[in-house]
């Protein structure tokens, strides 16, 4: 099992990916303890001195002007968690819940939240024991933070709600007992610290980013395979073309294509002196389109990595000055906009792949048998597989609609502008699945096309990509049940079968 020492505010993208993919044993670096304790001492001083501070001894939202008596402060925090656990929809899977929990721990341990070390350690214990709170997927608008999802997470700490332990849904109290853990009682400020934050939104978008990286790599490999299958030119990948424009994403994308295609291959030599002057855009403009997508991936990475290490609580405790200040770090607009831009990239990766599939279907453009199968008429070949790819590409166009431009006021107009970041991030998962399906069809089609160039081979790396598929999916000599082959290729893509053929590009 992966073991990780968490130094608050210093999580890397690779660490976040590992948390998402695998269970983790987490420990908090000792450097965080003094800051955590200082913020708690500041909160305790405010209570002891009878000062009024939002979230510590007041109500919440529109009720922020209501002063809460000291004897009700503990009940205030518990009531906050219970009342805000109002999510709906299917439960998030363990991987997503684990990522949200680690992001929450990372934020709280920065020492600006006034939450005791013992509560943070209780969250760490949930992660280490594999106790996963039941968090419904829907119910947050991304301001004031992800209240409902984080309330459902926090229920388990209190021994309320449900949690999954060793694959079984149990009452949280029972799950804690089986894992050898005890519920906690929250002190002043702690319920609000647990609930306020962008951790669900950020986790949703991070999953989208992780999947987009795999899709980008897979599409580059399949685009290179298609270039070979239809006897496309290597000239559009010439480094001088891309240096002249100066777009770094484009320059780097072209380099990836050159890495795969190398200088030549038996296929390339076979049409070295052909009559074609230019290839269609779906081949010739791959560096330009994929480079623009790569730029979006990199910008999204920058935003999400900053947010993963951010303090998005409210109010914030500045212990050195003895102050508690209300602000708006819970507003997930940066995450929403990043997710919107990532959606455009995922849609375009799939759209370009679908156009290359369509190109291979047309015998006049591809110089291959119609629909990539011999004895056409009796055999339909890839005819409907291309239709499936077109359907998926079209779905993604609607899903790519920006969420960050939408807003509905909540909390009696106190919270009058919200980000919709959770929905912006969550739809990326469906878009990624659609695009992976498109690329799977292209992989099948491109390998079939190269097979049909009998006796000719591609570059070593592209032959490796073809062999990886052919170990699981046979060449099409005649029509057969097609869906299992798409499913097989899709599974291989999700496992990173093609991504590993490329150097790091992020």
From Swiss-Prot:
The modification 2,3-didehydroalanine (Ser) is found at residue 144. InterPro entries: Aromatic_Lyase, Fumarase/histidase_N, HutH, L-Aspartase-like, Phe/His_NH3-lyase_AS. Keywords: Cytoplasm, Histidine metabolism, Lyase. One of its GO terms (biological process) is L-histidine catabolic process to glutamate and formate. It catalyses: L-histidine = trans-urocanate + NH4(+). Pathway: Amino-acid degradation; L-histidine degradation into L-glutamate; N-formimidoyl-L-glutamate from L-histidine: step 1/3. It is found in: Cytoplasm. Its main location: cytoplasm. GO terms for molecular function: histidine ammonia-lyase activity. GO terms for cellular component: cytoplasm. Its EC number is 4.3.1.3. Contains an active site 4-methylidene-imidazol-5-one (MIO), which is formed autocatalytically by cyclization and dehydration of residues Ala-Ser-Gly. Pfam families: Lyase_aromatic. There is a cross-link at residues 143-145 (5-imidazolinone (Ala-Gly)). It comes from the Bacteria. HAMAP family: His_ammonia_lyase. Belongs to the PAL/histidase family. PANTHER family: HISTIDINE AMMONIA-LYASE. This is Histidine ammonia-lyase.
């Amino acid at each position: 099992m992966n073991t990780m020492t968490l130094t608050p505010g210093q999580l890397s993208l690779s660490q976040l990916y590992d948390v998402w993919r695998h269970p983790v044993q987490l420990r908090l670096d000792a450097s965080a303890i003094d800051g955590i304790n200082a913020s708690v001492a500041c909160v305790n001083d405010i209570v002891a001195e009878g000062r009024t501070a939002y979230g510590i001894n007041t109500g919440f939202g529109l009720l922020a002007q209501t002063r809460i008596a000291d004897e009700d402060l503990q009940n205030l925090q518990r009531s906050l968690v219970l009342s805000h656990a109002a999510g709906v929809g299917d439960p998030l899977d363990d991987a997503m819940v684990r990522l949200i929990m680690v992001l929450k721990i990372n934020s709280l341990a920065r020492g600006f939240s006034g939450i005791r070390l013992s509560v943070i350690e209780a969250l760490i214990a949930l992660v280490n024991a594999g106790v996963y709170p039941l968090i419904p997927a829907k119910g947050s608008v991304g301001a004031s933070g992800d209240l409902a999802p984080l309330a459902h997470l926090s229920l388990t700490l209190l021994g309320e709600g449900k949690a999954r332990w060793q694959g079984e849904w149990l009452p949280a109290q029972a799950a804690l007992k089986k894992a050898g853990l005890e519920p906690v009682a929250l002190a002043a400020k702690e319920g609000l610290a647990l609930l306020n934050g962008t951790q669900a939104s950020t986790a949703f978008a991070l999953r989208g980013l992780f999947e987009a990286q795999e899709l980008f790599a897979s599409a580059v490999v399949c685009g290179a395979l298609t270039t070979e299958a239809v006897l496309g030119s290597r000239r559009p990948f010439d480094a001088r073309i891309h240096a002249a424009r100066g777009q770094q994403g484009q320059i780097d994308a072209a380099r990836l294509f050159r890495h795969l295609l190398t200088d030549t291959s038996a296929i390339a030599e076979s049409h070295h002196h052909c009559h074609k002057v230019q290839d269609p855009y779906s081949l010739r403009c791959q560096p330009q389109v994929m480079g623009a997508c790569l730029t979006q991936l990199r910008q999204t990475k920058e935003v999400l990595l900053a947010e993963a290490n951010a303090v998005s609580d409210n109010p914030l405790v500045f212990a050195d000055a003895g102050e508690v200040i209300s602000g708006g770090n819970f507003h997930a607009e940066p995450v929403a906009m990043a997710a919107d831009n990532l959606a455009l990239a995922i849609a375009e990766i799939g759209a370009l792949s679908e156009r290359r599939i369509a190109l291979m279907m047309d015998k006049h453009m591809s110089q291959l048998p119609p629909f990539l199968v011999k004895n056409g008429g009796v055999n339909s070949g890839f005819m409907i597989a291309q239709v499936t790819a077109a359907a998926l590409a079209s779905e993604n166009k609607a899903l790519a609609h920006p969420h960050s431009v939408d807003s509905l006021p909540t909390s009696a107009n106190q919270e009058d502008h919200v980000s919709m970041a959770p929905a912006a991030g969550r739809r990326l998962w469906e878009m990624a699945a659609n695009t992976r399906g498109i690329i799977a069809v292209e992989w099948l089609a491109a390998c079939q096309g190269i097979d049909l160039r009998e006796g000719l081979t591609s570059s070593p790396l592209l032959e490796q990509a073809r062999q990886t598929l052919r170990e699981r999916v046979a060449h099409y000599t005649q029509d057969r049940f097609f869906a299992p082959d798409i499913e097989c290729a899709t599974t291989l893509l999700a496992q990173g079968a093609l991504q590993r053929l490329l150097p790091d590009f992020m």
